[in-house]
Regions:
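Glycine-rich flavin
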Residues: 76-77, 87, 94-101, 106-247, ...
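Short hydrophobic core segments
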Residues: 81-83, 189, 208-219, 253-254, ...
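A Rossmann-like FAD-binding core segment of flavoenzymes
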Residues: 146-147, 182-202, 209, 270-367, ...
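FAD-site-proximal beta/loop scaffold in flavoenzymes
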Residues: 231-248, 329-403, 488, 492
Length: 539
């Protein structure tokens, strides 16, 4: 006899409780059922059945269900082995143990993964500090003295690292300390068979970990292009750049996507001369207008931006880097390589057990995070999904639900994305070209920020909000923005996309004044009105 706890969605009244209870009671082997509409839950006592049968019965009755916990004899506890210890790994471990599983987590490097140690957290600290330094000399407000502050980069790095260590302890190490169902192993894992991992532990011992389910959550690392001379040069990746205690005289940034733009602009704001070198255009995967606007902003701040530039060779002598980019010969004292990231899947033995990967080594998963081997799941930057920590965490949680017999899909159709330049860059949904490729007959409107009252009050009208909608119905398809606080604005757009709102719906909503998010309302109104002819706050 075991007890299975289910999360139930879709119940709105007492009749719903009754319908769910009848559906569960009708499953052979069920002896007792308690359903709570208020708690969105059901407790089922049963013997000789799998949780999947209970989930299926609830779904057949017209409601949603997933397994939240399964209690039984210790021998029944599902064993989940997780390779990695970042956002995806911890989200999965927490959810799996909530469902009654025991977890073995294996990490070869630093606990916590990229985001807290080398990515999101330290980069945002650096960017914020650099923005404050830049504003002191470049703000637009009369009567307030403009001056260039003294920068003590070593002190900035020390404060940044202090936050990294505090968050690693609070959000990762303490979870392990307080969850007895998670066993942590420091070491390097490789599949010995579809059912077992061999672990070369950091203490020199070898261990075999056998499990019922496996999650690959090993993240990604900077990808370095095969440019002649680059491998022998002492270039920076994002990790070295974020930890650097000196400000370069001239920083050359190889790559024009998120990491390169964020860190490069931060050093620009701290006083470095910066040159961006991109093989294609800036942010080639985003709406083309975004790259063009960001280039104008960077050049106005004093950066040099080279696009469609093919670097033929790199050399470094006496502390100076030399880049041959055809007609352009560049020289600088530091080189940041920010040309993308590659999955950390080498050495895991995936091909030997039949786990399919793409050409870049990313694990191919379906919407339920399953790999080509049914009991092996993957989540986070090591997969073929977008490389954002919140996507990784959501994927890890859903993978755990599915490993425990539930049914949780990861829907990325309204995924918000943010790049933390100044102003910020954000998007959700389809670009205009993507909508055309899907034959959705899109139309678009672009609202420059001199039409947004908050931007006028900030004396910073750089950027725009662009909306893409289905021409026939007005259904919102995508939102793309370059704006101050665009990262805050975009979540409202993502919710509108999720709700299948039209531009007319958005244009008629109440938005607070003066806020940057009001730009969404104003942009939506441009599909039918000339917003320049409207009064402030016009509804």
């Amino acid at each position: 006899m075991s007890t299975v706890a289910l999360r139930i969605t879709g119940m709105t009244c007492g009749e719903c409780e009754r319908h769910v209870k009848e559906a569960l009671t009708g499953v052979p082997g069920v002896t007792q059922v308690e359903v709570s509409q208020r708690d969105a839950s059901a407790q089922v006592e049963a013997s000789g059945i799998e949780p999947e049968a209970l989930v299926a019965a609830v779904k057949a009755a017209g409601y949603g269900a997933s397994v939240s916990k399964r209690e039984g004899a210790p021998s029944e506890a599902l064993h989940v082995a997780i390779v990695g210890s970042g956002g995806a790994a911890f989200a999965a471990a927490i959810r799996a143990t909530e469902g009654g599983a025991r977890v073995t987590m294996i990490e070869r490097g630093t606990l916590g993964g990229t985001c807290v140690n080398l990515g999101c957290v330290p980069s945002k600290v650096m960017i914020r500090g650099a923005d404050i330094a830049h504003l002191q000399s470049a703000h637009a407000f009369e009567g307030v003295e403009r001056r260039r502050p003294a920068i003590r980069r070593a002190a900035m790095v020390a404060q940044q690292q202090g936050l990294v260590e505090a968050l690693r302890q609070a959000k990762y190490a303490s979870v392990l300390e307080n969850n007895a169902a998670i066993r942590f192993v420091q070491g390097k894992a490789r599949f010995k068979s579809p059912q077992a991992l061999g672990v070369a532990r950091s203490d020199g011992r070898e261990e075999e970990v056998r499990a019922d389910r496996f999650l690959i959550a090993t993240g990604a690392s900077p990808a370095v292009p095969p440019i002649p001379g680059l491998a022998a040069a002492p270039y920076w990746t994002s990790a070295e750049a974020l930890a650097a205690e000196e400000i370069p005289e001239h920083l050359i940034v190889l790559g024009g996507s998120a990491v390169g733009l964020e860190i490069g602009q931060a050093f620009l704001h701290l006083g470095a001369r910066v040159t961006f070198v991109e093989l294609l255009t800036l942010l080639p995967r985003m709406d083309s207008a975004i790259g063009e606007e960001v280039r104008r902003i960077l050049e106005a701040e004093g950066a040099r931006v080279l696009v469609n530039a093919h670097v033929r060779s790199v050399s470094c002598q006496d502390g100076r880097f030399a880049l041959d980019a055809g007609a352009e010969k560049l020289s600088g004292d530091r080189l940041l390589v920010a040309t993308g990231r590659r999955p950390n899947t080498d050495g895991l033995g995936l091909s030997e057990i039949g786990v399919a990967t793409d050409r870049g080594g990313a694990v191919i998963v379906d919407e339920r995070l399953r790999s080509s081997v049914p009991h092996v799941y993957a989540a986070g930057d090591c997969t073929d999904q977008p490389q954002f920590v919140y996507v990784a965490a959501a994927a890890g949680t859903r993978a755990a639900v599915n490993m425990l017999g539930g049914d949780a899909a990861l829907d990325l159709s309204a995924m918000p994305a943010v790049i933390f330049t100044t102003p910020q860059i954000a998007s959700a949904g389809l670009t205009e070209q993507e909508a055309r490729d899907r034959e959705l007959s899109p139309e678009s409107r672009t609202l420059t920020l001199d039409n947004v009252p908050r931007a006028l009050a900030n004396f910073d009208t750089r950027g725009f909000v662009k909306m893409v909608a289905e021409a026939r119905t007005g259904r919102l398809l995508g939102v793309h923005a370059v704006a101050a606080e665009a990262g805050e604005l975009i979540q409202a757009a993502a919710l509108a996309l999720r709700a299948n709102m039209t531009v007319a719906d958005l244009g008629g909503e109440l938005f607070p004044y003066l806020t940057m998010v009001e730009g969404l309302k104003l942009c939506a109104q441009t599909f039918t009105k000339d917003v320049k002819q409207l009064s402030c706050c016009a509804g």
